[in-house]
Amino acid sequence: MDFRLSPEEEAFREEVVGFLAQELSEAVRLEYEERGLPGPLYHAFLRKLGQRGWLTLTWPEEYGGLGRPPIYRFIMVEEMAKRGVEYRNVAESIVAPSLMLCGSPQQKEHYLPLVASGEAVFALLYSEPHAGSDLASLELQAGSDGAGYTLSGQKLFSSEADMAHYAWVASRTDLNAPKHRGISIFLLDMKTPGVTVRPLISMAGDRRFNEVFIDNARVGRESLIGEENRGWYYVAAALDFERATAGAAMFIGNATYLVSRMIDYVKDNPAVQIGCPELRSKISGRATELEVLRMLSYQVLSLMSGGHAPTY
C-alpha cells in the first residue's frame, strides 16, 4: 500500500495550511488555550470553514457536501491541531452523520444547512450525575403521550451548553427495557421552557463545563431522531466514525504540535542537551511513533473509503 498522499490530497493540505496561516488568528488560539474548548471566536472561525465548504468535506453531494474521501477531513483536522487548536464541532461530527443515517426528511432539511454553515451551535447532553462513562445508565426520562414527549432530568459536563442553540439529548423512553435498549435521541431547542443552564465552576475558577436542568420540557414527535429506543445504536455508530477521523487526527496533530515545541525548546536551550544526552533519542522516538500512528490512520481511512466500518 502506498501511504503517501495523492497529488490532489497534498494540494488540499497546502490549501489548508495557507488558509490557517491567514484565518486561524492568535486570538482564536489563545481563546482556545484559555478555555480548553470552543468560544465565540472559535465559532466565528468555524463559520469561515463553512463558507469554504470545509464543514461538509465528506458529506454526500445530495446533502450539499463535496463528497470527498475521509482523508480530506483528517488533513484539515490534523493541520488545525498542529497549530494548537483542536477541531471540535459536535454539529458536524455527531449530529449531521446521525441525521443522514436516520433523520427524517424534515429534520435533514432544517438542520443540515445550519450545520453546513456553522451558524448553529449544538451541545451534547449525554453525561449525568449517575451516568458518566456508563452512558447506558442515564436516567433523564422522556415520557410520551402520543403527540409528543416531556423531558425531565439533569445533564452534567456539557462543554458548550451555555452557547448552544440546540442540544442532542440522550433520554430514557422505556424504563422496563434493558438499559441499552430503552434510550432515544432528541433534538432540543435550548430556548424551550424548562431548560436551565448553569456553569460548573471548578476550585480553580474553570468555567468550561455546564450542568443542564430539564424540568418538564415539552418537545414534539418531530424532535425524535430515528426510531424510539434505538438511540444507543445511533450514538455508537456516530462515535465509531468520529474516533477514526477527527479523533485520530486531533491526537496526532496535538502530539506533533507538542513535539515541535519540544524541539524548539531544546534548540533554544543548548544546556538542556548537555544535561540530558539521551534527549535527542527520546524526541526522535516520539516523532517516529507519531509517523506510525499517522500511517495506521491512513490505513483505516482507506478501509472507510472502501465502504468498511472503522471497526472492520
Task: Identify the function of each model-found stretch.
Residues G118-Y126, V169:
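A short, Trp-centered hydrophobic/proline-enriched beta-strand micro-motif
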Residues M1-R13:
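Intrinsic disorder at enzyme termini
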Residues H43, G50-E119, S159-Y166, L290, ...:
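Internal helix-loop-helix
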